[in-house]
Amino acid sequence: MTRSEKVEIIAKLEEGFKASEAIVVCNYRGLSTKKLEELRNNARENNVKVQIVKNTLANIALNNSGKTGLVLKDTNIYLWGEDQLSVSKVAAKFEENNDKFEIKTAYIEGEVADVAKVKALAKMPSRNELLAMLLQVWNAPITNFTIGLNALKNKKESE
């Protein structure tokens, strides 16, 4: 890889890392190409970026984007995106289904996060799911009132 290619990769990563709310670093050693393609497709559907890159290049991009403190060892695959939940869910779900895939560390909300935080975020409902729950709670009293009125109407009609 030439120096200009490395500079280009660093610039591209730096731009992505600056705009991201979450970066998850995972071990992918032993995964087949088919499984990696499955991860990329799933990530693409959820607006999550995935890239395998040398640790030195990733470290430079992370430092340039102001996200320091991640300890990078061995071979890593990086997942990042603007939505913390999407990134966490993609990584955690893929780890559940693949023994050879392992979440190592993450950078979430401006700080280094451990695996437990990534998995906890992955279990949280998405914004749309939360809105649906909220609407259900708001509609419950009206629904119960309507059911009560219909029951009263049916009782009056039967008398």
From Swiss-Prot:
This is Large ribosomal subunit protein uL10. One of its GO terms (biological process) is translation. Disulfide bonds: none annotated. It comes from Campylobacter jejuni subsp. jejuni serotype O:6 (strain 81116 / NCTC 11828). SUPFAM superfamilies: Ribosomal protein L10-like. GO terms for molecular function: large ribosomal subunit rRNA binding; structural constituent of ribosome. Gene3D superfamilies: 3.30.70.1730, 6.10.250.290. Part of the ribosomal stalk of the 50S ribosomal subunit. The N-terminus interacts with L11 and the large rRNA to form the base of the stalk. The C-terminus forms an elongated spine to which L12 dimers bind in a sequential fashion forming a multimeric L10(L12)X complex. PANTHER family: 39S RIBOSOMAL PROTEIN L10, MITOCHONDRIAL. GO terms for cellular component: large ribosomal subunit. The gene is rplJ. It comes from the Bacteria. Belongs to the universal ribosomal protein uL10 family. Forms part of the ribosomal stalk, playing a central role in the interaction of the ribosome with GTP-bound translation factors. Keywords: Ribonucleoprotein, Ribosomal protein, RNA-binding, rRNA-binding.
